[in-house]
């Protein structure tokens, strides 16, 4: 194979992100959304196989857990949770986020209220966030 054919073959190869690169890309998008008060649409875990629409999340904070996992905390206004679609504060692990995109939208009153109260990194008495990375 001539060198210019080899170069063309290399250029056309698809690029696959490693889990670390994908997590970094997700963190960048979610931190930007948290800092700018933006809404994201995310595909989480097995949502697609369940026939669920992408989740809509007002991003409040991104944190690093005691276990080394990254998490996003915010207000879900649409999405399958335990087989039903409802609004509530939610936490999502980065390693289960399949896709995330910033979308047009504004925080509703309940979401703004939840964000203004802040988050201590706990769910009930289970405090598992070591550090809030951005909000």
Model-inferred region functions:
Residues 23-135:
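Core beta-strand-centered patch of the WYL/Sm-like small regulatory domain
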Residues 6, 21-23:
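Short secondary-structure boundary segments
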Residues 1-7:
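Bacterial N-terminal signal peptides that target proteins for export
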């Amino acid at each position: 194979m001539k060198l210019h054919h080899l170069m063309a073959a290399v250029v056309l190869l698809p690029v696959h992100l490693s889990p670390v690169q994908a997590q970094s890309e997700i963190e960048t998008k979610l931190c930007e959304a948290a800092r700018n008060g933006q809404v994201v649409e995310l595909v989480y875990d097995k949502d697609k196989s369940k026939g669920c629409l992408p989740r809509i999340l007002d991003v409040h904070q991104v944190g690093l857990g005691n276990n080394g996992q990254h998490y996003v905390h915010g207000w879900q206004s649409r999405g399958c949770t335990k087989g039903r679609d409802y609004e509530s504060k939610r936490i999502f692990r980065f390693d289960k986020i399949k896709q995330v995109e910033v979308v047009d939208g504004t925080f509703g009153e309940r979401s703004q209220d939840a964000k203004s109260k802040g988050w201590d990194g706990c769910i009930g008495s289970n405090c598992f966030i070591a550090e809030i990375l951005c909000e």
